[in-house]
């Protein structure tokens, strides 16, 4: 699943490609992707201009000229790309936004898990997932006081807590493993067992790692690609995720992979101890 850095990379690319573009018409080939009535969805966006594209956590927010916002969740495999009108759309394209400048904005999703929801701008929090979403992993929102209070009252293991979008927005499996390794914290540690210093270190590593991953245009492990159809580059800078059986960069101990809350989890057994 694309995590915050990947979704932010897509957002930036789409803003360069389609901000200011006007939708002529829409074709929907897999209606379940649309959470609204499909005919109404198509009618309400026809002849509307994409003013900008914002992001909240892992959700893209397409802002339209008529005061509507399309909340797009890519889920596991969703991706957007822009092609000239008439170009082969591919067998996994499920929604096409025909633009008035003879281009098509394609939504492609091999798993068909992605969802689009049209709401009045300002009412994005009525969409499931956004209703309870936590702060963004940036210094201004993810404060030490917030993290200390949140972790202090939870006996939950630290990794699944980091994956809980109601606690912190945008962290997924890759960046949870990476930031816990950077912080030398075992993924199964109870959140309330972390010291203030450990929380402060983890917080800073989350903020720094997400910023660096965005700068690296996200991580391509399976199929992620940018709005320009290019792979991300940050997979070349991962320290622990996907490196089971390889030596830890810091101490040389072999990286192990275990299941934590049903998620494959990579860690250094020497430096990340329970």
From Swiss-Prot:
A zinc finger (FPG-type) spans 239-273. PANTHER family: FORMAMIDOPYRIMIDINE-DNA GLYCOSYLASE. The gene is mutM. Monomer. Belongs to the FPG family. It comes from the Bacteria. It comes from Lactiplantibacillus plantarum (strain ATCC BAA-793 / NCIMB 8826 / WCFS1). One of its GO terms (biological process) is base-excision repair. Its EC number is 3.2.2.23, 4.2.99.18. Its cofactor is Zn(2+). Keywords: DNA damage, DNA repair, DNA-binding, Glycosidase, Hydrolase, Lyase, Metal-binding, Multifunctional enzyme, Zinc, Zinc-finger. This is Formamidopyrimidine-DNA glycosylase.
């Amino acid at each position: 699943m694309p995590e915050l850095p990947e979704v932010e990379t897509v957002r930036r690319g789409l803003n360069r490609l389609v901000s200011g573009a006007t939708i002529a018409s829409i074709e929907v080939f897999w209606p379940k992707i649309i959470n609204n009535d499909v005919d109404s969805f198509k009618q309400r966006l026809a002849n509307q201009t994409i003013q900008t594209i914002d992001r909240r956590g892992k959700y893209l927010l397409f802002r339209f000229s008529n005061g509507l916002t399309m909340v797009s969740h890519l889920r596991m495999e969703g991706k957007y790309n822009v092609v000239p009108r008439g170009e082969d759309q591919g067998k996994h394209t499920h929604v096409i936004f025909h633009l008035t400048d003879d281009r098509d904005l394609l939504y492609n999703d091999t798993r068909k898990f992605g969802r689009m929801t049209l709401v009045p701008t300002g009412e994005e929090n009525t969409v499931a997932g956004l209703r309870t979403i936590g702060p963004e992993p940036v210094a201004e929102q993810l404060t030490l006081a917030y993290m200390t209070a949140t972790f202090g009252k939870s006996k939950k293991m630290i990794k699944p807590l980091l994956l809980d979008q109601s606690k912190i927005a945008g962290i997924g499996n890759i960046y949870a493993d990476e930031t816990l390794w950077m912080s030398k914290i075992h993924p199964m540690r109870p959140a309330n067992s972390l010291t203030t210093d450990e929380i402060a270190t983890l917080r800073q590593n989350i903020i720094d790692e997400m910023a660096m991953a965005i700068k690296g245009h996200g991580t391509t492990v399976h199929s992620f690609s940018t709005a320009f159809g290019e792979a991300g580059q940050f997979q070349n800078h991962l320290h622990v995720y996907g490196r089971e059986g390889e030596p830890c960069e810091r101490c040389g101990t072999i990286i192990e992979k275990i299941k934590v809350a049903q998620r494959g989890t990579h860690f250094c057994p020497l430096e990340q101890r329970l």
